[in-house]
Amino acid sequence: MNYFDLFSLPVIFPIDQTRLSETYRELQKQYHPDKFVMQNDSERLRAMQKSTEINDAYQTLKNSCLRAQYLLLLAGLDIALEHKTLQDTAFLVQQMEWRETIAAFTEDDQDKMDEFALQLQQQVAGLESKIEVQLQNDELEATADSIRQLKFMLKLQIELVLIEEKLFD
């Protein structure tokens, strides 16, 4: 059973996050290991495994990047453990510029940081839309490249948060 089936969701990139969360809570109640404490060892083990599967599926489906990777896996392309890098020169140059921008922020740049965070969020949203279209068109290699870009953007968002915490805490 794939993760989408487990949560009774269609196998598509955009998902109903509310429905995902509601189904997660229902499944966790149903398969929580504490409910099986009086069962035999094999039933307790089965409940623990099912609970772990539910948690893994939920973490994968709620995260757009992991969800896109999982859809690629279902389509026959596994990029989870690859070490392939982007070959998009323009994006690589943009990466360097973004990193320089983040490195240059000071305590006086809160407004600039907020603006930059908004730009990053717009980039992420654009990549997610691009991935959705690429998946619909079965453009697996192009989707893989977009996922690599999305991973970078999500890491960059985390770096920005860490810089803000360092500067303002």
Swiss-Prot record:
Transmembrane segments: none annotated. One of its GO terms (cellular component) is iron-sulfur cluster transfer complex. One of its GO terms (molecular function) is protein-folding chaperone binding. Keywords: Chaperone. InterPro entries: DnaJ_domain, HscB, HscB_C_sf, HscB_oligo_C, J_dom_sf. One of its GO terms (biological process) is protein complex oligomerization. Residues 2-74 form the J domain. Gene3D superfamilies: DnaJ domain, HscB, C-terminal domain. Belongs to the HscB family. Co-chaperone involved in the maturation of iron-sulfur cluster-containing proteins. Seems to help targeting proteins to be folded toward HscA. NCBIfam families: hscB. Interacts with HscA and stimulates its ATPase activity. This is Co-chaperone protein HscB homolog.
